Amino acid sequence: GCGGNGLVLSATDSRACRKVAVKKIVLSDARSMKHALREIKIIRRLDHDNIVKVYEVLGPKGSDLQGELFKFSVAYIVQEYMETDLACLLEQGTLTEEHAKLFMYQLLRGLKYIHSANVLHRDLKPANIFISTEDLVLKIGDFGLARIADQHYSHKGYLSEGLVTKWYRSPRLLLSPNNYTKAIDMWAAGCILAEMLTGKMLFAGAHELEQMQLILDTIPVVREEDKEELLRVMPSFVSSTWEVKRPLRKLLPDVNREAIDFLEKILTFSPMDR
Amino acid sequence: MSEDSNMEKAIKETSILEEYSINWTQKLGAGISGPVRVCVKKSTQERFALKILLDRPKARNEVRLHMMCATHSNIVEIIEVFANSVQFPHESSPRARLLIVMEMMEGGELFHRISQHRHFTEKQASQVTKQATLALQHCHLLNIAHRDLKPENLLFKDNSLDAPVKLCDFGFAKVDQGDLMTPQFTPYYVAPQVLEAQRRHQKEKSGLIPTSPTPYTYNKSCDLWSLGVIIYVMLCGYPPFYSKHHSRTIPKDMRKKIMTGSFEFPEEEWSQISEMAKDVVRKLLKVKPEERLTIEGVLDHPWLNSTEALDNVLPSAQLMMDKAVVAGIQQAHAEQLANMRIQDLKVSLKPLHSVNNPILRKRKLLGSKPKDGVYIHDHENGVEDSNVALEKLRDVIAQCILPQAGKGENEDEKLNEVMQEAWKYNRECKLLRDALQSFSWNGRGFTDKVDRLKLAEVVKQVIEEQTLPHEPQSSEIALLVCRAGTWKRL
């Protein structure tokens, strides 16, 4: 298939006799190569049941990258092969509640590990969450490569109406695109849980402004500083009473109360409350 | 060849800033190739639309095909093209780019127009159709397939009632030499032949069918199918082929509808729409290209040439106001653009009781569900302190490895802080103490410039030394309690 960051092929490592996924990354300049390799170093040090394992990183024709950081314009990441990803599964509809719980548990377990190493994923979404259909092991993949390898222009100001959708972005990240904290991964994890239970994306805005509107319709804003910032940034879209039109319980009527309670605690507007 | 040389001559090498000022922050829209901005000609103060592409063969192709077509009054005009080096704020160096100056379409997109004019009539719809068809005819006479015909690519010149409609965005366009086979489409408007090309392409790729010496191809008539879909949406406000679920790829039920040409004229909206209009739609949405209405057939159709009054107000204006419908369409577009693939594979999940999952295995070994709020430890206090010490060391590694976004001084201070914390919890570690001496650590900070990668490597060895006598940390904490205590236990 084609991952978001380039061509991804499955292959067999002939030395280690194991099936691997090989991802080709095209690096257009020295700076992005440097950033990508730094990210790769992070990934290679992460060793956990619920993180996709990166075995090695090679240059063209399988050459060793050691000491030749800036000579290549492509790199190949040899990593653990996983049969499918959560996006493919959700494509087919909802998961059972027990599958969703098992996957969510493993997702949080993986997040706890990387957050304890002070690493942020920053691009958590179903397509970056891999599932082994054999034993239902879930692994988080594609660490930060989307940001490093895809050097697309990112809006540094306030909300924009560009075509790029950011369905798993937390309200803080929508307001301040470069304000990355561990809490943004938790927001994305909450959206993913809701999607596993309902088969639908939780907040699927066509653009950032609408994304924020959808969030405000459902997630209450309780802190004064958040209200002040919203009034400054998008005054015409905020209702004067700060009422939510569709609280989570009404938005997800078929989801059981305990899962709703969990979602209400993880999908808070302020990152500090998450 | 002569066309190519003419095109190359038309591209200017001088800086665009000599003749135009550019509004970098105002974006008019986004095509498949990128955002479109406003620029102003300095000599006349005229406003134009500016599209900036990386200078690549694909971009040159887009420019060439658009320039070939742009002589028609229903196609957005290209004023001139510049080849300049441009550096955006997030880039470290300038890159070669094509800057395409086009006429400004002040009237905006077709759907937006329909939703604003709440009295959009069938006559107006037929007028839009005629102009779109004339634009398409012009392309096809040049043997060029547009391949991305959709309402977003139909723009009004201005806001007057009889403003002309023009076709834009040739990012997917291609000369039809009988070799159109690369699947290029956005959902809702995609022709069945393109879906079939996609299906075969995927099967060949995965080896399910051999790569054919005569690959499956489609032709310019895929644009006519898209035209049929656009007419349908204009008339009633929603697409003919749809799915109940918004999805990141074309859902199976929607694909099946497209492949079989199954659509309806629901009574609620279509009872007030003329039979002539329905006839055009039916004849365009034929699965077999040879059965499909031709361009000339559309232009000759009574619906486009009737002197009869077609003043009935269409329901599309009201339905177009329904934000959920528009958002759904836009969402599908955006997702499809970002993820040009269709998953054919059916994946099924095993029930939990028949799965050998490590988490489930551990729960069986423990024999019971964990108590509220309790981690299961091998050692109580020692492991707690040890965990903190290890976490501080990991923070040092993260600080060394993470890309340095800020100023050097701030980063150095952060490294000193993190190292100080780790030092506080790891004073007894001889390996760490010896290593830090070689990095000029004075107990509170580094006095010299630090090679961060080497420091990270050393700290990693310290962590490995501390964890070797015990099980890896991930096993020591056997279970994680979910944040919401009341959520059902796994």
UniProtKB/Swiss-Prot annotation, chain A:
Keyword Oxidoreductase attributed: no
Example of a GO biological process term: intracellular signal transduction
UniProt remark on domains: In contrast to classical MAPKs, the TXY motif within the activation loop is replaced by the SEG motif, whose phosphorylation activates the MAP kinases.
Active-site annotation: D123 (proton acceptor)
Chain's gene name: Mapk4
EC number per UniProt: 2.7.11.24
Protein name (record): Mitogen-activated protein kinase 4
Binding site residues for ATP: G1, C2, G3, G4, N5, G6, L7, V8, K23
Pfam families with a match to the protein in the record: Pkinase
Organism: Rattus norvegicus (Rat)
Activity regulation field: Activated by phosphorylation in the activation loop.
Tissue specificity as recorded in UniProt: Exclusively detected in the brain, where expression is restricted to the choroid plexus and hippocampus, and to a lesser extent in lung.
